């Protein structure tokens, strides 16, 4: 049996502009209100992921404190806020999750992902950055991170990372940038 993934717009029953219950499928990417004519296009959410290496070439790895993938390995990062650039978003997320201050970012690549939040499948475009931090003294697990630690790159097993895009990103980083 082939299981079709639910489209995120399936949960939207009312027009976000006028509130009418006349919000119908317009095409694969949008819904249209038959009452006011408003068309809403579904777009992905922007997220960031940080590769942070210390002076010994070890990677900063975090353990997820919350679902999805609670207890699995992760890298610092998260959703980009409404008026942030990717660089600003990754710096803020690194600080919120680890206490480390990012002083330089270098964009590497992006990967699509899905993130199940409160039963709602959020589609994301995850931007991967190499980040240099001011110093390593303030490292601590905060926000949605249960633990953070330095791990030798040669001992990293991408399969231990719980989120698909992070797992694939770690594989790519180890292959292309090591």
Which ranges hold each PLM region?
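NUDIX/MutT-family hydrolases
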Residues: 140-170
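Conserved N-terminal beta-strand and adjoining loop/helix that marks the start
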Residues: 35-59, 79
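A broadly conserved sequence feature marking short terminus-proximal activation segments
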Residues: 1-11, 156, 170-177
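Active-site-adjacent beta-strand/loop module that shapes the phosphate/pyrophosphate-binding cleft
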Residues: 109-137
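Conserved Nudix-box catalytic region and its N-terminal flanking loop in Nudix hydrolases
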Residues: 2-5, 54-96
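Short cysteine-rich clusters marking metal-coordination/redox-active sites
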Residues: 15-18, 33-36
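Short metal-coordination and nucleic-acid-contact micro-motifs, chiefly zinc-binding Cys/His arrays
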Residues: 8-12, 29, 46
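Short functional micro-motifs and their immediate structural scaffolds
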Residues: 23-24, 41
């Amino acid at each position: 049996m082939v299981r079709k993934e639910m489209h995120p717009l399936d949960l939207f029953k009312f027009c976000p502009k006028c509130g009418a219950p006349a919000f119908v499928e317009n095409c694969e990417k949008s819904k249209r209100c038959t009452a006011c004519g408003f068309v809403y296009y579904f777009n992905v959410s922007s997220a960031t992921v940080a590769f942070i290496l210390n002076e010994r070439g070890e990677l900063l790895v975090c353990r997820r404190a919350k679902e999805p993938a609670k207890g699995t390995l992760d890298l610092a990062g998260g959703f980009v806020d409404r008026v942030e650039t990717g660089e600003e978003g990754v710096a803020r997320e690194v600080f919120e999750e680890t206490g480390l201050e990012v002083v330089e970012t270098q964009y590497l690549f992006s990967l699509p992902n899905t993130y199940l939040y409160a039963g709602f499948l959020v589609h994301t475009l995850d931007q991967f950055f190499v980040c240099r931090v001011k110093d390593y003294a303030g490292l601590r697990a905060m926000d949605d991170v249960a633990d953070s630690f330095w791990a030798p790159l040669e001992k990293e097993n991408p399969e231990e990372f719980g989120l698909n895009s992070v797992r694939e990103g770690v594989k790519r980083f180890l292959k292309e940038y090591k």
